[in-house]
């Protein structure tokens, strides 16, 4: 069961925003405070907005509307694909193809080409269609490129009515196309984002893997519930005093611009200022873990 409580959000690092110098002032209503050079997101607002988004997404999908999940940053790719497939919806988790929405007819031709090549691969007809090994290799490379870019939307017959985005600042082109065509946009918005571009903004860390996974799992459940599937009801709770949030923060920037996070009394890990994400591991003493593989 997805639990969107202040305690759970704290444990997954949702409250960590970006450096204060990188913030978008329009995020002010969702910022609790600033500590040691970074903004701390108000998790009471996160819980409230997550519930609003869940209810709206459930209602919209119950009306037959389709969802396109978008998240091309490394931290989001796996969860985007997993939760889109689980909810039987569509996804883009690598490069956003410019014009995917606004030039849909052209994209449909590329999807048709992808399906043709997949059919050739399935019945081993590459060698029958072309004469040389070089041509076969060229076709296989084309297939892999199309599959990587369009594989998550190859069964998308029409433009969807809803887009769910991880990091709308990074996915700026996708958001612009969606707004132009009137799609309902749901998004996790960090402190450097413009929430006014989003119909249903959810304030939170859009860099931490566990935070991203929590949001996507919850919203995927909303889609499943809306389309008649059976999922455990998520729990939305504001059961932790928000003033405790800033007190849990243990990090600071050193003189070289490195972000220092206490992992234990005997060791420290640093993270460059250009990589703002961090996750918190629950323990008696707050511990912050950096995703070293990302």
UniProtKB/Swiss-Prot annotation:
GO CC, alphabetical: cytosolic small ribosomal subunit
Regions of compositional bias (Basic and acidic residues) in chain numbering: 256-274
Bias type Polar residues, positions: 280-294
Annotated GO MF terms: structural constituent of ribosome
Region (Disordered): 256-294
GO biological process: translation
Pfam families the UniProt entry points to: Ribosomal_S2 (PF00318)
Keyword terms, alphabetized: Ribonucleoprotein, Ribosomal protein
PANTHER family for the chain: 30S RIBOSOMAL PROTEIN S2 PROKARYOTIC AND ORGANELLAR, SMALL RIBOSOMAL SUBUNIT PROTEIN US2M
Similarity field: Belongs to the universal ribosomal protein uS2 family.
HAMAP family per record: Ribosomal_uS2_B
Protein name: Small ribosomal subunit protein uS2
Record organism: Leptospira interrogans serogroup Icterohaemorrhagiae serovar Lai (strain 56601)
């Amino acid at each position: 069961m997805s639990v969107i409580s202040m305690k759970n959000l704290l444990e997954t690092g949702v409250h960590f925003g970006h450096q204060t110098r990188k913030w978008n002032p329009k995020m002010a209503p969702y910022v609790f405070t600033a500590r040691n050079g970074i903004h701390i997101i108000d998790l009471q607002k996160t819980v409230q907005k997550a519930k609003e988004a869940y209810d709206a997404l459930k209602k919209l999908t119950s009306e037959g509307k389709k969802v396109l999940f978008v998240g091309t940053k490394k931290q989001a790719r796996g969860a985007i694909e997993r939760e889109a497939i689980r909810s039987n919806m569509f996804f883009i988790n690598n490069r956003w193809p410019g014009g995917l929405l606004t030039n849909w007819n052209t994209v449909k031709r590329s999807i048709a080409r992808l399906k043709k090549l997949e059919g050739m691969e399935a019945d081993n007809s590459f060698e029958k269609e072309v004469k040389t090994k070089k041509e076969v290799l060229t076709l296989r490379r084309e297939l892999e490129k199309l599959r990587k870019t369009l594989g998550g939307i190859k069964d998308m017959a029409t433009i969807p009515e809803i887009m769910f985005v991880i990091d709308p600042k990074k996915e700026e082109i996708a958001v612009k196309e969606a707004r132009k065509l009137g799609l309902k946009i749901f998004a996790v918005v960090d402190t450097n984002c413009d929430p006014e571009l989003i119909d249903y903004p959810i304030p939170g860390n859009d860099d931490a893997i566990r935070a991203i996974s929590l949001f996507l799992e919850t919203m995927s459940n909303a889609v499943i519930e809306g389309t008649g599937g059976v999922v455990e009801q998520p729990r939305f709770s504001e059961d932790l005093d928000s003033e405790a949030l800033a007190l849990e923060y243990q990090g600071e920037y050193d003189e070289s611009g490195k972000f220092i996070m206490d992992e234990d009394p005997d060791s420290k890990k640093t993270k460059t200022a250009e990589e703002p994400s961090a996750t918190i591991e629950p323990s008696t003493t707050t511990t912050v873990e950096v995703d070293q593989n990302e």
